[in-house]
Amino acid sequence: MKNLQNESFIIRCLKAAASPSGVCRYGKTFSWLQVTFLFMFLTACLMVPFTISFMKMDRFNVQSFMPSAMQKVNDRFADQLQGFQIRNGKLTGGKSSDRIEDGQNLLAVDMEHEFKTSGENGRLKVTGYDNAIIFQSEHLIITDQNGTGFSVRYAKMDAKLKNPNTHDVESFINEWWLAQYKPMIMMMACTVIFMIQFFLIAVLAGGMWITKLSNMISIASFQEAASIAICASALPAFAAAAVGMVHFDLITVLMIHSCGVTLMISFTFRYLAKTRRYKGELHSGGKYDKSAVI
């Protein structure tokens, strides 16, 4: 054990991640501080492809979570926006301020702020309407009957709405929404990745620690169980990150990582079941006494 601990931290990490036997042999050589660092490093690796992919995005499909409101956009409403322009984050110009009402649905250009809203951003509502898209002087209001509603600032750019059609209006909304809420989405996604990684490691470490009570495997402490779980997740994390860098899909990345960790832990558990610890070292052989140690 002392000889293993004398090796550098990087070398121990690489050897521990290389194979199930390496995971078992080097699992006890890491301190809690090192275990925490490894956990954070591997979690960051999983976040890298998402961050890079998301930074390249210039618009987000708002219709995916506000379908009813976005489906109301039509060419008639697009014609109302003809001649308007965005300058320094403000809507100016234009000749028409008509509204299009259809039951509880509203499409309007409201330069006078006639329509009232209630609720906090994210759950915003326009009084009297279920679905609404309202262009005001400094921001866009979009609410959906599913309870979702946002106030979206116009991007700090110069843009002229010249002969817009339905697709153009949808593209503008998608672009403006992402420009304002990109940090929020990134934070939420990174939090999801962190929680999944933490839950997975905690369950695996706890499961291995519990098996100690039945003498199925030789685990000296919960720290060692946590270290083994984290080291076993290293190769799957690198593989998932590599796939994500080529073509990012959050679900695919998480599935590759989760399935890889499960397989690696299975092989590690099998290796531990075939070995026993004697004087701090892993040996093949019997289950209970020293006579079986090779």
Sequence positions of predicted segments:
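Hydrophobic alpha-helical transmembrane segments
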Residues: F30-T51, T117-G128, I133, Y181-Q197
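General structural signal for secondary-structure boundaries
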Residues: I11, G27-W32, A44, N146-A155, ...
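Internal alpha-helical transmembrane segments
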Residues: M1-A69, A242
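Hydrophobic alpha-helical transmembrane segments and adjacent short intramembrane/lumenal linkers
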Residues: T166-E281
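Short, highly charged, low-complexity non-transmembrane loops/tails of multi-pass membrane proteins
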Residues: T275-I294
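Long, solvent-exposed extracytoplasmic domains/loops
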Residues: N61-E175
